[in-house]
Regions:
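Sec-dependent signal peptide recognition
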Residues: 2-9
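Calycin-type beta-barrel ligand-binding domains and close structural analogs
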Residues: 19-35, 43-55, 59-179
Length: 179
């Protein structure tokens, strides 16, 4: 059970660790994808049924923005997200907005992450942008875009998949929300 908890914490850190100081795509132009909305529960490989599962709650904030909450019974992290496309690759740009302790600190620099996603059979697979290919140390959006373009055909541009299953519509209110 301790190993499962460590895996759960590791998955939480992978999904929520903000990697970049600047966004890959700064503006939200694409309309939201309604099929992403709702509550998603993690699908761990070796779950024993004892530990709480993480939940990913995706709500519509505007025509182009999502409000995203990720966590388990003990802690949550909050993002705003928007769909983007670059080099023919569709992804979601995430910006960390806070956690259970409140909004992000003005001193925090790494507020942005980039994830790809696939939907099918009631499951959502989320993959993180590979920071071995697109360095966390790039300091502006243009440099990030150049590195992204240079690796666009690399099969591990997005890696470390996390799987989630869709829960019923009533589940959107299961997690406490911060307003």
């Amino acid at each position: 059970m301790r190993i499962l908890r460590l895996i759960t914490v590791f998955t939480f850190l992978i999904l929520t660790a903000c990697d970049f100081n600047v966004p890959l795509v700064a503006k939200a132009f694409l309309p939201i994808d309604q099929t992403l909305l709702g509550t998603w529960e993690s699908i761990p490989e070796d779950w024993d049924g004892q530990e709480p599962l993480e939940r990913l709650v995706i709500r519509q904030q505007s025509a182009n923005l999502y409000e995203i909450e990720f966590g388990d019974e003990a802690s949550h992290i909050y993002f705003k997200g928007w769909l983007a496309e670059l080099e023919g690759i569709r992804f979601m740009q995430l910006e960390c907005t806070g956690d259970d302790k409140g909004p992000v600190d003005a001193k925090d620099k790494r507020l942005f992450s980039v994830v790809s996603f696939t939907l099918g059979n009631g499951e959502l697979v989320v993959r993180s942008l590979n920071t071995d290919l697109v360095s966390r140390d790039l300091v502006n959006t243009a440099a990030l875009q150049v590195a992204f373009a240079a690796n666009r055909d690399n099969p591990i541009l997005f890696h470390k998949p996390d799987q989630f299953r869709r829960l019923g519509e009533r589940s959107v209110d299961d997690l406490e929300t911060r307003k």
